[in-house]
């Protein structure tokens, strides 16, 4: 029996916290149109994601994918690190 998996949401965002073990907080920035004025307004939503090997560091650009609930707040997992942060 070959059942096909449902499509899962994939987001790209910046790591804003990596202080937890095997967990990162990713801020995904996007925009919405203001209902009255029609201007595009930027906003960010933060997601907690599972990082099994602690690969992602602060300010890295990462890709996360929706998955089953892993804890009370984690619903995403790290797919890959797109761009490493520049350390000065």
Curated annotation (Swiss-Prot):
MF annotations from Gene Ontology: rRNA binding; structural constituent of ribosome
UniProt key word Coiled coil: no
Domain of life: Bacteria
Gene Ontology CC terms, in alphabetical order: cytosolic small ribosomal subunit
Classification via Pfam families: Ribosomal_S17
Gene Ontology biological process: translation
UniProt xrefs under NCBIfam families: PRK05610.1, uS17_bact
Function: One of the primary rRNA binding proteins, it binds specifically to the 5'-end of 16S ribosomal RNA.
Annotated protein name in UniProt: Small ribosomal subunit protein uS17
């Amino acid at each position: 029996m070959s059942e096909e998996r449902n499509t899962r949401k994939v987001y790209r965002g910046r790591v804003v916290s990596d202080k937890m073990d095997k967990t990162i907080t990713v801020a995904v920035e996007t925009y919405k149109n203001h209902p009255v004025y029609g201007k595009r307004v930027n906003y960010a939503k933060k997601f907690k994601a599972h990082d099994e090997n602690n690969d992602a560091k602060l300010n890295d650009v990462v890709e996360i994918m929706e998955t089953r609930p892993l804890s009370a707040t984690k619903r995403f997992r790290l797919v890959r690190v797109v761009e490493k942060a520049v350390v000065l």
